[in-house]
């Protein structure tokens, strides 16, 4: 029974649509009309990212991610705990944009 549960969990974790890349990109995150909060993107894919933010953000909140050289990008908070959060992009980033950040070392 434990093996079946582990296999099911493994399948669930493998369902991501986009490959995530470890990065370290300084940026900002804003919601509503508040000024941007400084963040560090720690992983990036075309469909979303993981960030270090230092504060709690409510799940399913519409936020705007600002990265160097890009316009603010609309996202939703997928999860938030211990000063970190996962964001899902409303529209995927072009793969060339992701590769640019990865090639630059994040």
Segments predicted by a language model, with ranges:
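N-terminal helix initiation/capping motif
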Residues: 1-42, 95-106
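Short alpha-helix capping/helix-loop boundary micro-motifs
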Residues: 13-16, 47-52
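Short acidic/polar mixed-charge low-complexity motifs
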Residues: 35, 69-71, 83
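Short beta-strand-centered aromatic/proline hotspots
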Residues: 38-40, 74-78
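Structural motif
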Residues: 45, 80-81
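Short, solvent-exposed secondary-structure boundary/capping segments
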Residues: 49-53, 83-92
